[in-house]
Design a protein with these regions (language model features):
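Anion-recognition interface
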Residues: 4-270
């Protein structure tokens, strides 16, 4: 079979929109399509070229690498169709901040994201319309645009949209709706941030494409951070939390500017 005749579907995340659930609990259960797991993403192009399945599903969640990765896959397989999931901005940025906090970043939310656009997370990282423009730039096919909220509200409707789009099948009895990764509490994250501000000023580097360095230089810190958060579970809340991890009033005001961006997503979501 020619590569140009193969049907290819590319789930691009975003991160913190239920990607891990899909990658562990749903995509492997789909019938009638070859799923290339996130661990094999780095060689997915070679896998597709060297095998002869009728259709393939690739999955990997992106944030700042979004355009680079979309361009890379579409350059090799222009027929690729994109699956993208968005989440309300307020919930999404909160979840991103918590993810960075548990990975050793000990800055405040205001340094992570602020209205002056001088934080680690910038306005251009927040605009979903920019990501849709990137998809349109490289793909001539209509993407499947989903809302993370629907996964919570009506999971089987959400999952069926993916199976229908990809021409695959699944059985409800095969799907576990259990959360893959539970979230850490505010108390645990605050305690870890205090720990890192003293003992680990710079977060450990993540080696996505080097397993040896990943286990030698990143994984030990990952394990220590988890131990610290487990320890914090037993400490009094009043001892740890002097102020909220995220100021809700500040967050709400900061996210107002993205109301129209979210409305655009609602208007095109499937």
């Amino acid at each position: 079979m020619k590569n140009s005749e193969k049907e290819i579907y590319f789930h691009v995340g975003l991160a913190k929109t239920g990607s891990t659930f899909l990658q562990n609990n749903f995509f492997p259960k789909l019938k009638g399509i070859k799923y290339i797991s996130t661990h094999k993403y780095w060689r997915c192009i070679n896998i597709i070229k060297r095998t002869n399945y009728k259709s393939y599903l690739i999955s990997r969640e992106f944030d700042r690498q979004f355009e680079f990765e979309v361009k890379k896959i579409l350059k090799e397989f222009p027929q690729t169709k994109i699956i993208v999931v968005f989440r309300k901005h307020e919930k999404w940025i909160s979840s991103q901040f918590k993810r960075h906090s548990k990975n050793g970043y000990h800055w405040s939310f205001e340094k992570f994201y602020n209205n002056e656009n001088t934080g680690f997370w910038r306005k251009e990282d927040m605009l979903y319309s920019i990501k849709m423009d990137i998809i349109k730039k490289y793909s001539n096919n209509k993407p499947l645009v989903l809302r993370f909220e629907e996964l919570k509200e009506n999971p089987y409707s959400y999952l069926s949209k993916i199976s229908n789009y990809t021409g695959s099948r699944y059985s409800k009895s095969d799907i576990s709706l259990n959360v893959v990764h539970g979230s850490w509490s505010e108390k645990q994250l605050i305690f870890l941030k205090k720990f890192c501000s003293i003992f680990k000023k710079n977060p450990p580097e993540y080696y996505a494409n080097n397993k040896i360095l990943h286990w030698l230089l990143y994984r030990p810190w990952w394990l220590l951070f988890h131990f610290v958060m487990y320890f914090a579970y037993f400490l009094p809340k009043s001892y740890i939390i002097k102020k909220p991890l995220i100021n809700k009033e500040y967050l709400s005001k900061s996210m107002k500017k993205y109301d129209n961006d979210w409305k655009k997503i609602l208007s095109i979501s499937d």
